[in-house]
């Protein structure tokens, strides 16, 4: 465990020009910026052209609020960024620190995004073959080509493969992987039974395999998570732990 922590501490992604994107995506900033311009224009026109004081005041308040929101989102983006505040990297570090993997065999990353977690796993465990799957919707600007370029830049392209996939129905046979990871994915899948998503992920895990799945384990999404953890133990999973990682990142 100490050796793995040492390896993790030595890994810094994105130092060769790789693009890992950001959880605070550009479309969000562009949308807020666009609304700011519109409300600012309305405030100006209402005041100087139409002389509608109430509308001008309301639009000005909206514009100031949007400006503050844009500044906050920009700060959050900086905190998340690789090479910035490093929040994304710290989260990935924490998730993999709980994966008791010997580094031999196949590892699956469900919802790989820009490939950062998959690539970090490949760097930590040089004998592992890593597969990353994602639906790659438009919200974050991630994609398969981005993942493959990042893996090549970090020198692990030969051991990483990325493919389009759906966490609801993984396109792999039962017991295909020795380790499974996922970070902050399931809560984003609308109208899905979150427990069913976890069970689909665990379906492809080999007997004796290990997993580390990080998500918002809110009762409205997962129900009683302690009860669910016990159900997994009753099904034969030898060690199931619920860990609050909020203080670790």
What do the predicted segments below correspond to?
Residues 114-126:
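Conserved SAM-binding loop of SAM-dependent methyltransferases across substrates and taxa
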Residues 168-180:
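A short acidic, Gly/Pro-enriched loop at the edge of an enzyme's catalytic core
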Residues 208-215:
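Conserved beta-strand signature within the Rossmann-like core of class I S-adenosyl-L-methionine
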Residues 195-207:
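A short glycine-rich, Lys/Arg-flanked "PGG" loop and its adjoining helix->strand segment in the class I
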Residues 103-113, 131:
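Conserved class I S-adenosyl-L-methionine
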Residues 86-104:
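Conserved alpha-helix/loop element of class I SAM-dependent methyltransferases that forms part
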Residues 20-30, 70-91:
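Class I SAM-dependent methyltransferase Rossmann-like catalytic core
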Residues 125, 189-191, 205-207:
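Helix-to-beta-strand junctions that scaffold the AdoMet/dcAdoMet cofactor pocket
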